Structure formats: structure tokens, C-alpha cells
Amino acid sequence: MIIGIDYGAKMAGTTVIACLHEQNQVTLHACAKNQDADQFILDFIKSYDDVWLAYIDAPLSLPIAYKRLNGNNDYFYRKADRITGAMSPMFLGGLTARAIQLKEKMQKAGVKLVETYPSKLAEVLLLKNEGYKKDKEFIPQLCSLLKEKSDFVFDENQVKTWHHFDALLSLYSAKRFEMQAAMVFGNPEEGTITV
């Protein structure tokens, strides 16, 4: 089973998991406010023992300058961030540290965690011109477009926030990887973003 995760602040209730089942059926699972988001993800994986791949909207590495390799002196952005327009892992600070720690825990559980960036996939799928991240009123229209492009089957009424929609985009990035249609940005030595 593959999942997509929109990763939020630890206790904010903004973390959402999109889970792909048989026949392209998708379910959405949202972390509650004041619930530990990291534990929510780990508990979810334990409850579904067949999860093998998870795509997450969070940095999973630091700029290569911190490894003192190749004489690179960009301490703020990785190549992948510059190419995709993603935020600096350093700006995201604690979220980045939590995501890297989560990656280690998930690897121990047999789950491969891959960094994705839903905004870049929205650009690739031409969803930005359709109101992506503009106003919540665009979510139903974008859900319909995503269903057409992905063949996902899900209840649009469950997509209540942009966090839910980004979880779906993260899941579609994982699906694109399965279909060998993914795009990879950045330097593998430093960390890549896959959509």
C-alpha cells in the first residue's frame, strides 16, 4: 500500500494522510488538533502492515554545505529547493528535524519515506491556473481535475482543507513513482524532491 502525507506542525491538527487502496480507492485520515502528528503517522502505519511507500510534503535532508562536500556554501537551500521553489529546510527548522527523525523510524518499520512537494506537482498538472491554494471554494473543482488525471476514487466531501488536497497530491506523486512517471529534482547526494 502507498500513502501520501501532508505534514504539519506537531500538535496543530494539520497533518493528513491519503491512503491508496484497491481499485484506486482513496481514503483520507486527518490528525486531530492537540494530537501528536508523528505518533499519528506511526500508529497509522502499524495499523496497516502492508504500507511500503510513503511520500511526504516535508524536507528529509539538509543542504549539502552541512556535509562539507563539494565546496558548496549554500547553507539555506538545497538544489532541489531552488529548482522547485520549495521552502528552505532551515526555515522550516523543527519540522525538518521531525521529518528526518520520522524517516528513520519509518525505515525501521520497513516503509520507504520519500520527499515530495505538492505545489510543484500542482504546477506540473496545470492546477495552479485552476485556483490551487487560492480559496477553499476551488477545492471541489480541483478534486474533479485530480480525479481525471489520477483515476483516484474518493469522496470530495472529505477534502475539507488544502492539507487534505496536498495529501492527495503527495499520494499521486507516489503513484507516479509506481507508474515510472515521476520527476526527480535535485542532487541525490544532498536530497531530492520527487513529484
Task: Outline where the language-model segments fall.
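Phosphate- and other anionic-substrate recognition elements at nucleic-acid/protein interfaces
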Residues: M1-V195
